[in-house]
């Protein structure tokens, strides 16, 4: 798994979730423009095996989670328009693990999601006004256990 460290000027918010899995970090130089969410089951079920692919160009990509035994059967591609300013969703237990079960991304122009089951404990990563999310970090293994955001001034 690729590991990229955030620039020293970036602030962090989060992570939310549990401490299972291994740490990952994605802080591209270019703006985020696409997030691919992969699920096992249908998109209205849980993100029990979510695989999140963040990208800012064809060569600056990281995929986290989704390495468990269930096949990934559904993919949702989110083409980001604007600056991401908030991440929210649900954390809930799945097979004994507290994991990210649904997720929503909000930009200064629109909302994307929520994707996954609307059940569990809500979480919200909202950054201070005048800033934008420029990268993500967290823990993952079979599941996306935790997620946080790097942010900087617009």
From Swiss-Prot:
Pfam families assigned: Jacalin (PF01419)
Gene Ontology biological-process annotations: defense response to insect; positive regulation of stress-activated MAPK cascade; protein homotetramerization; response to wounding
Swiss-Prot/TrEMBL induction comment: By wounding of the leaves (at protein level). Expressed in unwounded leaves on day 7, indicating factors in senescence may up-regulate the expression (at protein level). By plant hormone methyl jasmonate (MJ) in leaves and to a lesser extent in petioles, but not in stems or roots (at protein level). In leaves, both local and systemic expression is induced by mechanical wounding. Increased expression is detected in wounded local leaves after 6 hours, but expression decreases at 12 hours after wounding.
UniProt keyword terms in alphabetical order: Lectin
Renumbered residue ranges of the record's region Involved in regulating the binding affinity to carbohydrates: 1-10
All residue ranges annotated as the Jacalin-type lectin domain in the record: 10-153
UniProt cross-references to InterPro entries, sorted A to Z: Jacalin-like_lectin_dom, Jacalin-like_lectin_dom_plant, Jacalin-like_lectin_dom_sf
Tagged with keyword Repeat: no
Cleavable signal peptide: none
SMART domains: Jacalin
Known tissue expression: Expressed in leaves (at protein level). Expressed in leaves and to a lesser extent in petioles. Not expressed in stems or tuberous roots.
Binding, a carbohydrate: 21, 97, 141-145
PTMs per UniProt: The N-terminus is blocked.
Highest taxon above the source species: Eukaryota
UniProt cross-references to SUPFAM superfamilies, sorted A to Z: Mannose-binding lectins
Gene Ontology molecular function, alphabetical: carbohydrate binding
Activity regulation (UniProt): Hemagglutinating activity is completely inhibited by methyl alpha-D-glucopyranoside or methyl alpha-D-mannopyranoside. The activity is also inhibited by maltose, glucose, galactose, mannose and lactose, but not by polygalacturonic acid, mannitol, sorbitol or sucrose.
Summary of subunit composition and partner proteins: Homotetramer.
Family listed: Belongs to the jacalin lectin family.
Function in brief: Lectin involved in defense reactions of the leaves in response to wounding by herbivorous insects and pathogens. Retards the growth and development of silkworm thus reducing their survival rates. Has hemagglutinating activity against human erythrocytes.
Identification of the protein by name: Ipomoelin
Organism, scientific name: Ipomoea batatas
